[in-house]
């Protein structure tokens, strides 16, 4: 295993070196995104305050203090000094998203027309307008939510509609490779049919279904109207064509990622921090996967082109994902400097929607959506324990954040069903900054375990792990 890891790392390094011009341009764009966001945050923050788009830090004030401030604000009795002390600019995600989209669009133009991406519409970046449109729609939806406070049922519908541009331009495989145990079960139960062909006659005009023995590399195939829906190889691996069902899965992935970042929030820096950790893990994954540049899996060499594309992780997929992830890390790092404890700006729903969409879109573009779900393990856990409140089985307040104790300046368990309160329940009261770092440590551990599952434990389910 050690020798294999060394060899894979060497191949990844060679692949990165081969694509150094493109990766260098992406890195340059990421630096520009970081510097530009850092430069404009103070100006945009003042503009948002002037437009009365601000919030009060719940974890640094009591309910009585917030009500008193709101009453003074309505009566026009708030002094400027008091206002500047209490009010924190909100929805800075709109600036971050705008800077990100500007940089990515410029990078796409440069890569397409300066020779790095090839010529014509067949270059790997020609399909990016769809993903970028989805990111734009989600960003604007988040800003609308900041201003109008959209209800949850409407959020689900709108995020589903926002994922349509991505789904319409998706050019990847619609097949799923199942573990070997799945195929071996079929082999053991249907072994008596190995040397036979079974033709099922159908009325004229109806689809014809055939079970056929094929080439040695593909032991069993289930075909309807020349479309292979199930293929099982001699090794036992099964490739199942899902078609439109897979597109529904991708849409649901966008909905989940967008809202999961949004509900794991409430303390300074946690939204941006978790997004940065997942994005960095995704970058590492894509760089490592570049070692497979134009390598085909022998067991599936005879399958159709769509199946081959699913197993042939060419660098085109990774470069597109890195193009989306690099500038995102840049703008998020700049926002982190202002949003970490003590927060000088709030990111708002515009950032959480934007961040979740970028991570989902990059995984779909880079063909690693299942691996992304491993990185999202804390968000999945937080979502599962939140279900009783999200479905109103138990009372659900508007803000499910921990309770702030003004005497100790610590956060305590508010008995809401979130991972933040689980940590406080297990380890006791914490300072807000310490709680944020505890969440980020959990996120790092989840990403490391995700790599272990992806490259080590999956070997027990698949004959070949790439």
UniProtKB/Swiss-Prot annotation:
Associated pathway: Protein modification; protein glycosylation
GO molecular function: glycosyltransferase activity; metal ion binding; UDP-N-acetylglucosamine-dolichyl-phosphate N-acetylglucosaminephosphotransferase activity
Cystine bridges: none
The family this protein is said to belong to: Belongs to the glycosyltransferase 4 family.
Transmembrane parts of this sequence: 12-32, 91-111, 124-144, 156-176, 236-256, 263-283, 316-336, 345-365, 374-394, 442-462
Entry keywords, A to Z: Endoplasmic reticulum, Glycoprotein, Glycosyltransferase, Magnesium, Membrane, Metal-binding, Transferase, Transmembrane, Transmembrane helix
Catalysed conversion reaction: a di-trans,poly-cis-dolichyl phosphate + UDP-N-acetyl-alpha-D-glucosamine = an N-acetyl-alpha-D-glucosaminyl-diphospho-di-trans,poly-cis-dolichol + UMP
InterPro entries noted in UniProt: Glycosyl_transferase_4, GPT
Ligand binding (UDP-N-acetyl-alpha-D-glucosamine): 57, 90, 268, 398-400
Glycosylation sites: 59, 416
Subcellular locations according to the entry: Endoplasmic reticulum membrane
Modes of activity regulation: Inhibited by natural nucleoside antibiotic tunicamycin, which acts as a structural analog and competitor of UDP-GlcNAc.
Membrane topology annotation: Multi-pass membrane protein
Binding site for dolichyl phosphate: 155, 255-263
Cofactor list: Mg(2+)
Positions with a binding annotation for Mg(2+): 262, 349
EC numbers, comma separated: 2.7.8.15
Note: In Leishmania sp., tunicamycin-resistant variants are associated with increased levels of NAGT gene transcription due to gene amplification.
Protein name as catalogued: UDP-N-acetylglucosamine--dolichyl-phosphate N-acetylglucosaminephosphotransferase
GO-annotated biological processes: dolichol-linked oligosaccharide biosynthetic process
Main location: endoplasmic reticulum
Task of the protein: UDP-N-acetylglucosamine--dolichyl-phosphate N-acetylglucosaminephosphotransferase that operates in the biosynthetic pathway of dolichol-linked oligosaccharides, the glycan precursors employed in protein asparagine (N)-glycosylation. The assembly of dolichol-linked oligosaccharides begins on the cytosolic side of the endoplasmic reticulum membrane and finishes in its lumen. The sequential addition of sugars to dolichol pyrophosphate produces dolichol-linked oligosaccharides containing fourteen sugars, including two GlcNAcs, nine mannoses and three glucoses.
Organism annotation: Leishmania amazonensis
GO cellular component labels: endoplasmic reticulum membrane
């Amino acid at each position: 295993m050690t020798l294999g890891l060394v060899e894979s790392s060497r191949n990844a390094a060679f692949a990165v070196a081969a694509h150094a011009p493109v990766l260098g341009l992406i890195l340059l764009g990421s630096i520009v995104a970081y510097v530009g966001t850092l430069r404009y945050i103070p100006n945009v923050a003042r503009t948002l305050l002037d437009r009365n788009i601000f919030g009060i830090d719940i974890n640094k004030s009591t309910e009585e203090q917030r009500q008193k401030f709101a009453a003074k604000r309505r009566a026009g009795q708030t002094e400027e000094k008091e206002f500047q002390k209490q009010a924190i600019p909100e929805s800075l995600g709109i600036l971050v998203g705008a800077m990100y989209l500007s940089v990515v669009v410029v990078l796409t133009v440069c890569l397409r027309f300066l020779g790095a991406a090839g010529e014509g519409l067949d270059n790997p970046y020609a399909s990016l307008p769809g993903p970028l449109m989805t990111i734009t729609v989600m960003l604007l939806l988040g800003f609308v939510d900041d201003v109008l406070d959209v209800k949850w049922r409407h959020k689900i519908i709108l995020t589903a509609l926002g994922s349509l541009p991505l789904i319409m331009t998706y050019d990847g495989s619609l097949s799923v490779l199942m573990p070997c145990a799945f195929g071996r079960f079929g082999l053991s139960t249907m072994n008596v049919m190995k040397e036979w062909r079974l033709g099922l006659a159908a009325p004229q005009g109806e689809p014809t279904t055939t079970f056929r023995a094929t080439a040695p590399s593909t032991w069993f195939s289930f075909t309807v109207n020349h479309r292979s829906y199930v293929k099982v190889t001699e090794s036992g691996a099964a490739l199942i064509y899902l078609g439109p069902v897979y597109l529904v899965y991708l849409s649901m992935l966008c909905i989940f990622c967008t809202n999961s970042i949004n509900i794991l929030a409430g303390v300074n820096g946690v939204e941006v921090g978790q997004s940065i950790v997942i994005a960095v893990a995704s970058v590492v994954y894509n760089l490592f996967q570049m070692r497979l540049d134009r390598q085909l899996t022998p067991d599936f060499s005879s399958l159709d082109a769509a199946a081959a594309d699913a197993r042939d992780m060419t660098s085109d997929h990774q470069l597109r994902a890195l193009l989306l992830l690099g500038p995102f890390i840049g703008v998020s790092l700049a926002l982190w400097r202002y949003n970490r404890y003590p927060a000088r700006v709030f990111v708002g729903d515009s950032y959480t929607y934007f961040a979740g969409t970028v991570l989902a879109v990059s995984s779909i573009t880079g063909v690693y959506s299942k691996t992304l779900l491993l990185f999202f393990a804390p968000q999945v856990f937080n979502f599962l324990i939140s279900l009783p409140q999200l479905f109103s089985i138990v009372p659900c307040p508007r803000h499910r954040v921990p309770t702030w104790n003004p005497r100790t300046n610590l956060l305590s368990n508010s008995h809401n069903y979130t991972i933040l309160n689980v940590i406080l329940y297990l380890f006791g009261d914490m300072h807000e900054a310490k709680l944020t770092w505890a969440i980020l440590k959990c996120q790092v551990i989840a990403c490391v375990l995700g790599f272990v599952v992806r490259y080590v434990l999956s070997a027990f389910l698949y004959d070949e792990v790439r």
